[in-house]
Amino acid sequence: FPSFAASPLETHFAADPNQKMDAWYGEQIAKYTTDPAFNTQLTRSLPASDTVPTPAKAMGDVSGAPNMLPRLKTIHDYFRSLAASSPRVKVFSIGTSEEGREMIAAAIADEALLADLENNRQRLAQLADPRLIGLDDSRAQELITQSVPVYYITGAIHSTETGNPSSLMELA
């Protein structure tokens, strides 16, 4: 199959020349990737931050590194450290598992949306069920203009799916 790295899409993902990059992080990902075709500009140009931690700071290496499987506490601590270091991350406790382990969700957005999450949720609920707005198209358009779509990405549903939590740490 053709490599994404060699595709025309690659040019659309150029790094911001003003953004400091984490060269070590990109090198580690390249080292652990089984085929260079899987690496793209996105994995070669990872932004660096003096305040927001990377998964490597939580685990000692990049997500997906050989022989590295993060424990639940490490994963939760990482997401909470993101929330503590960035106004664009908020962590919620959403209950406990059958075995009594805490389950969390992380919302990642701009500060304004995080401050307005509940109102945004209510607007989206109205759009999801047009009966709530009396099937009023003009009200629907107003809600669309005021609302921000939410993308829900989940992982770690099954204990044998060990890569998902690491992937979510990386994605965050």
Kindly label every feature range from the protein language model.
Residues 1-5:
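Hydrophobic h-region of N-terminal signal peptides that target proteins for export
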Residues 6-172:
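Structured catalytic-domain cores with a bias toward divalent-metal coordination
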